[in-house]
Amino acid sequence: MERALILAASAIGAGLAMIAGIGPGIGQGFAAGKGAEAVGKQPEAQGDILRTMLLGAAVAESTGIYALVVALILLFANPLLNLL
C-alpha cells in the first residue's frame, strides 16, 4: 500500500513539475515578440537586441529544464522508494 501511494504521489508531482514548463514558454514568446518589435523600431541595434533576447531565453528555459529533470527523477529514479 505504501509503495502504491509513493508511486501515485510521484506521478502527481511529476505532472505538477511539468506544468512549470508553461511559464518559460509564455515568457519566451513574450520576449521574442518584444524583441521583434524592438528590432522593428531600431534596426541598427539588432545585434544587441538579439544577444540580450537569447540570453533571457536561455535563463527562462533553465526553469523548464529543471522541472523536466525533477519529473524524470521522480518517475524513473525515485529516491523515496528506498525508504520503504
Curated annotation (Swiss-Prot):
<comment type="function">
    <text>Key component of the F(0) channel; it plays a direct role in translocation across the membrane. A homomeric c-ring of 11 subunits forms the central stalk rotor element with the F(1) delta and epsilon subunits.</text>
</comment>
<keyword id="KW-0406">Ion transport</keyword>
<keyword id="KW-0066">ATP synthesis</keyword>
<feature type="transmembrane region" description="Helical">
    <location>
        <begin position="6"/>
        <end position="26"/>
    </location>
</feature>
<keyword id="KW-0375">Hydrogen ion transport</keyword>
<dbReference type="InterPro" id="IPR035921">
    <property type="entry name" value="F/V-ATP_Csub_sf"/>
</dbReference>
<keyword id="KW-0812">Transmembrane</keyword>
<keyword id="KW-1133">Transmembrane helix</keyword>
<dbReference type="InterPro" id="IPR002379">
    <property type="entry name" value="ATPase_proteolipid_c-like_dom"/>
</dbReference>
<dbReference type="InterPro" id="IPR005953">
    <property type="entry name" value="ATP_synth_csu_bac/chlpt"/>
</dbReference>
<keyword id="KW-0472">Membrane</keyword>
<feature type="site" description="Reversibly binds sodium during transport">
    <location>
        <position position="65"/>
    </location>
</feature>
<keyword id="KW-0138">CF(0)</keyword>
<comment type="similarity">
    <text>Belongs to the ATPase C chain family.</text>
</comment>
<keyword id="KW-0739">Sodium transport</keyword>
<dbReference type="InterPro" id="IPR000454">
    <property type="entry name" value="ATP_synth_F0_csu"/>
</dbReference>
<comment type="subunit">
    <text>F-type ATPases have 2 components, F(1) - the catalytic core - and F(0) - the membrane sodium channel. F(1) has five subunits: alpha(3), beta(3), gamma(1), delta(1), epsilon(1). F(0) has three main subunits: a(1), b(2) and c(11). The alpha and beta chains form an alternating ring which encloses part of the gamma chain. F(1) is attached to F(0) by a central stalk formed by the gamma and epsilon chains, while a peripheral stalk is formed by the delta and b chains.</text>
</comment>
<keyword id="KW-1003">Cell membrane</keyword>
<keyword id="KW-0915">Sodium</keyword>
<dbReference type="GO" id="GO:0046933">
    <property type="term" value="F:proton-transporting ATP synthase activity, rotational mechanism"/>
</dbReference>
<dbReference type="Pfam" id="PF00137">
    <property type="entry name" value="ATP-synt_C"/>
</dbReference>
<comment type="function">
    <text>F(1)F(0) ATP synthase produces ATP from ADP in the presence of a sodium gradient. F-type ATPases consist of two structural domains, F(1) containing the extramembraneous catalytic core and F(0) containing the membrane proton channel, linked together by a central stalk and a peripheral stalk. During catalysis, ATP synthesis in the catalytic domain of F(1) is coupled via a rotary mechanism of the central stalk subunits to proton translocation.</text>
</comment>
<dbReference type="GO" id="GO:0005886">
    <property type="term" value="C:plasma membrane"/>
</dbReference>
<dbReference type="GO" id="GO:0008289">
    <property type="term" value="F:lipid binding"/>
</dbReference>
<keyword id="KW-0813">Transport</keyword>
<feature type="transmembrane region" description="Helical">
    <location>
        <begin position="64"/>
        <end position="84"/>
    </location>
</feature>
<keyword id="KW-0446">Lipid-binding</keyword>
<protein>
    <recommendedName>
        <fullName>ATP synthase subunit c, sodium ion specific</fullName>
    </recommendedName>
</protein>
<dbReference type="GO" id="GO:0006814">
    <property type="term" value="P:sodium ion transport"/>
</dbReference>
<dbReference type="GO" id="GO:0033177">
    <property type="term" value="C:proton-transporting two-sector ATPase complex, proton-transporting domain"/>
</dbReference>
<dbReference type="GO" id="GO:0045259">
    <property type="term" value="C:proton-transporting ATP synthase complex"/>
</dbReference>
